């Protein structure tokens, strides 16, 4: 299925203090049968290198083990190291996520991800948020 979103997020310092706002442009396709994954643009406005022409992302759910999500950025013919750590937390609808940059900066849609990302350990969880109350 095709996905096209502009998701607001909060930027936190490595110490977990709110440091501003950003947006993430998500545009691509999600594969839900077999290995669940996303291929396309995941442009974090706070991280200029992720917004460059030709840079795409591959996000996998249940990546290295059940409940683990990861992200890899690439350009035609090469993987890119853009200062974004490989592991992240992201829901399958892609509207809720948390990730950490290599300098410790945290970018997240929900403050609940901050302590998880500050710990430096990635827990096997399946972050699912329902719109049903």
Briefly describe each language-model feature range.
Residues 52-133:
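Non-cytosolic head/periplasmic domains of membrane-anchored proteins
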Residues 17-69:
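Extracytoplasmic/periplasmic/luminal assembly and interaction segments
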């Amino acid at each position: 299925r095709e996905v096209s979103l502009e998701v607001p997020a909060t930027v936190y310092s490595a110490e977990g203090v709110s440091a501003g706002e950003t947006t993430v442009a998500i545009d691509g396709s999600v594969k839900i049968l077999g290995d669940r994954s996303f291929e396309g643009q995941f442009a974090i406005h706070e991280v200029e290198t992720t917004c460059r022409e030709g840079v795409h992302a591959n996000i996998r759910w249940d990546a290295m083990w059940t409940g683990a999500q990861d992200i890899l950025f690439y350009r035609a013919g090469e993987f890119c190291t853009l200062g974004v750590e490989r592991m992240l937390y992201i829901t399958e609808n892609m509207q809720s996520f948390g990730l950490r940059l290599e300098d410790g900066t945290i970018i997240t849609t929900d403050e609940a991800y901050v302590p998880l990302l500050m710990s430096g350990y990635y827990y096997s969880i399946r972050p699912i948020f329902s719109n049903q109350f």
